[in-house]
């Protein structure tokens, strides 16, 4: 697997990233999704993409469960702009 620098963060990420938009909503069984996330390390992939907007944050929950025991091995990219609730601080990059 080829790796590249993630901007100026000092992190090295695989050039292939696992997208998790289908995880957490029943499209893919959570157990299977977790197995997929575990298996990518065997193929040299350390980069996982998710978002709070993917199925009301359920994708992030599945990713969290999957990486819990080996968190230091993964680089997780997420997005945090879309509304997650009705409150004034439930969207965007608020401090909350």
Could you describe each region identified by the protein language model?
Residues 1-75, 82-84:
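N-terminal binding-site loop/beta-alpha segment at the start of enzyme catalytic domains
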Residues 27, 86-96:
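Glycine/proline-rich, positively charged
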């Amino acid at each position: 697997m080829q790796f590249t620098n993630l901007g100026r963060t000092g992190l090295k990420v695989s050039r292939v990233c696992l997208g998790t938009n289908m995880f957490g909503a029943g499209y893919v069984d959570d157990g299977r999704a977790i197995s997929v996330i575990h298996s990518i390390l065997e193929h040299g992939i350390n980069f996982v993409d998710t978002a709070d907007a993917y199925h009301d944050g359920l994708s992030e929950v599945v990713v969290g469960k999957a990486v819990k025991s080996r968190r230091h091995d993964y680089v997780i990219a997420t997005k945090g702009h879309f509304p997650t609730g009705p409150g004034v601080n439930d969207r965007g990059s608020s401090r909350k």
